[in-house]
Curated annotation (Swiss-Prot):
<dbReference type="GO" id="GO:0061799">
    <property type="term" value="F:cyclic pyranopterin monophosphate synthase activity"/>
</dbReference>
<keyword id="KW-0501">Molybdenum cofactor biosynthesis</keyword>
<dbReference type="Pfam" id="PF01967">
    <property type="entry name" value="MoaC"/>
</dbReference>
<dbReference type="GO" id="GO:0006777">
    <property type="term" value="P:Mo-molybdopterin cofactor biosynthetic process"/>
</dbReference>
<feature type="active site">
    <location>
        <position position="127"/>
    </location>
</feature>
<protein>
    <recommendedName>
        <fullName>Cyclic pyranopterin monophosphate synthase</fullName>
        <ecNumber>4.6.1.17</ecNumber>
    </recommendedName>
</protein>
<keyword id="KW-0456">Lyase</keyword>
<comment type="function">
    <text>Catalyzes the conversion of (8S)-3',8-cyclo-7,8-dihydroguanosine 5'-triphosphate to cyclic pyranopterin monophosphate (cPMP).</text>
</comment>
<dbReference type="InterPro" id="IPR036522">
    <property type="entry name" value="MoaC_sf"/>
</dbReference>
<feature type="binding site">
    <location>
        <begin position="112"/>
        <end position="113"/>
    </location>
    <ligand>
        <name>substrate</name>
    </ligand>
</feature>
<comment type="subunit">
    <text>Homohexamer; trimer of dimers.</text>
</comment>
<feature type="binding site">
    <location>
        <begin position="74"/>
        <end position="76"/>
    </location>
    <ligand>
        <name>substrate</name>
    </ligand>
</feature>
<comment type="similarity">
    <text>Belongs to the MoaC family.</text>
</comment>
<dbReference type="InterPro" id="IPR047594">
    <property type="entry name" value="MoaC_bact/euk"/>
</dbReference>
<dbReference type="InterPro" id="IPR002820">
    <property type="entry name" value="Mopterin_CF_biosynth-C_dom"/>
</dbReference>
<dbReference type="InterPro" id="IPR023045">
    <property type="entry name" value="MoaC"/>
</dbReference>
<comment type="pathway">
    <text>Cofactor biosynthesis; molybdopterin biosynthesis.</text>
</comment>
Amino acid sequence: MKLTHLDEKDRPKMVDVSDKEQTTRVAVASGIIEMSQDAYDAIVTQKTKKGPVLQTAVIAAIMGSKKTSELIPMCHPINLSGINCDVEELPELPGFKLSVTAKLTGQTGVEMEALTGTSIGLLTIYDMVKAIDKGMVIRNIQLEEKAGGKSGDFKR
């Protein structure tokens, strides 16, 4: 398989998608942050000094998805039609699972937007409670599923 982000002289390029058909594309990504019981309790009881952690993480995830093309050089700037972020409490870890769904009708996929949003949301949680627990671990940031586009559907 030839990498599409390299030209015939192996120089980086952004892929030309102008000839691609516009289709509806959806991607879901997720990741987990593990933390101490003290950090978890501070978040769920909303007793952190920096404010409502999970609500802020949701907003950050949405913002991160929208900024993907500014952070990842070969990503196209796209007009996302929808972004949704869900946070699930995982008291057994303790920690949280954050999931981002990105959607558009366009000529390129939204996997990177979902993955970037997930990463930024989790990093925001870390930032807001690092005073309580610097040993938090962010893990398993992954594409869960995608639909639409030439490469077909994917489900983990």
